Every structure is written in C-alpha cells, then in structure tokens.
C-alpha cells in the first residue's frame, strides 16, 4: 500500500490576491483511504478541484504517476433526473464495455435497480449510483467530497463500508474529505488535518493500526480532536 499514486507538491491557491491554500504537500498511496479532515469552508473542495483539474493552482504541482483518470463523488449525487440509473452510469464513458457498468452496479448493490430513475431511488441509493458512475469513469483514484453528510447515521456507515470494500476488493485509492472525526477514524488509513487561514496541512496521523487496539483508537480520537 506504500506505492505513490498521486502527489500534491507545494500547492497554493489565491482568489483575488487572497491566499486560500498555502503550500499543501501530501501523497496518496495505491489502495488506501486517505482522509482530509477540516472545518467547512476551509478550502478542501478547492483542493479537490485542483486535483481533478477543474481549477488551476496558483503555484505548485500535482503529480499523477500513472496519468490515471480521477473520479469525483460530490456532496450532491448529481444524477440526471431524465436518465435511468444505467444511463447515468454509462454517460461518463459512452464507449465502455457495458459489462463494466453491470459489474459496478453490482459492486454498489444496485444491479436490480438499473432501470430506475433517480426520483425512484432513496438518498443512499442515489449516492451509490454516483459512486458507480465515478468508478466507471475512473478505476484507480476516487475523490469523495463529503458525499454522506446529508444521510442518517445508518446510511452513512453503510456507505463508509462500501468505500472500504472498494479499497479491499478493487485496490482503489480514495481521498475522503470530511469534517466528521468518527467517519475518518472508521474508514481511513491515514488522516491529513487541514486548518488555518490560509489553510495548511498541519499534521498527518496514521490510524491503520488503531482499529486493532481499542486503547490506541481512543488515543487517536483524542489526538484528532486536539488538532481540530
């Protein structure tokens, strides 16, 4: 899991001469869930937009070691209401083998709902659909921008389990943005703490062993709360 797949190198971003992101450095590894934890409005979404190329950094470099496509799971599912679930997944890659679409729908537990329209799906199912769509577009790297925040606790943790399943079964690298410490501890292997104005990565916390040791898990939670 230590193979680098994506690196942010000295990334800074200004809006109208106001510095928003300041010297952001981190690396993503193959087959890990990397958490990005910080308060709302600090610049986490801006950083994700830079990673996928929809915004340009003021300075610094993004290194994508395999020139991999990057899939994006937004806060809102952004499914097209006039398309079926199958069509929503297919639209990101019209020439793709439909077998892959079926595999991804099955992976997220929606194979039997392929002909449903978004209005017929629950909030959790719609987000599963958006995950299937992101998977179909990009098989190696996914960015999750707080996509579970509007869901109840049960659904949130079902989708966190799905995220861990993608890592385990497909070796997918995931950058998971959240402001929820409990979610981060439950799902992530490492957590980056973003804070300050302008925003910086203040600390990296490795928590992959804390799930085995209950005492260590409590210590990590205390450490995270202190950092935030």
Model-derived regions, located:
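Conserved ABC ATPase signature
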Residues: 117-121, 125
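Catalytic Walker B motif of ABC-type/P-loop ATPase nucleotide-binding domains
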Residues: 142-146
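The feature captures the beta-strand-to-loop junction immediately N-terminal to the Walker
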Residues: 37-39
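Hydrophobic anchor residue at the start of the ABC signature
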Residues: 131
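Helical segment within the ABC ATPase nucleotide-binding domain
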Residues: 156-170
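Helix-to-loop junction immediately C-terminal to a conserved catalytic motif
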Residues: 52
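Conserved ABC ATPase "signature" region
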Residues: 98-113, 163-165
């Amino acid at each position: 899991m230590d193979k680098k797949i994506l690196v942010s190198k000295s990334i800074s971003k200004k809006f109208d001469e106001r510095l928003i992101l300041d010297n952001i450095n981190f690396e993503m590894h193959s087959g890990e869930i990397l958490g990005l934890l910080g308060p709302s409005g600090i610049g986490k979404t801006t950083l994700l937009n830079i990673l996928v190329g929809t915004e340009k950094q003021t300075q610094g470099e993004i290194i994508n070691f395999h020139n991999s496509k990057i899939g994006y799971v937004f806060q809102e599912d952004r499914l097209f209401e006039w398309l079926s679930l199958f069509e929503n997944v297919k639209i990101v890659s019209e020439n793709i083998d439909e077998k892959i679409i079926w595999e991804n729908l099955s992976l997220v537990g929606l194979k039997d709902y392929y002909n449903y329209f978004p209005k017929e799906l629950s909030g959790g199912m719609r987000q599963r659909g958006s995950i299937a769509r992101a998977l179909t577009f990009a098989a190696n790297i996914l960015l999750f921008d707080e996509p579970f925040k509007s869901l109840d606790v049960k659904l949130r943790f079902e989708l966190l389990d799905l995220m861990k399943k993608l890592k385990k079964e497909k070796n997918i690298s995931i950058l998971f943005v959240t402001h929820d410490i409990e979610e981060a501890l439950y799902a992530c292997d490492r957590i980056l703490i973003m804070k300050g104005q302008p925003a910086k990565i203040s600390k990296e916390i490795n928590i992959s062993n804390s799930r085995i040791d209950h005492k260590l898990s409590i210590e990590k939670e205390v450490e995270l709360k202190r950092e935030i």
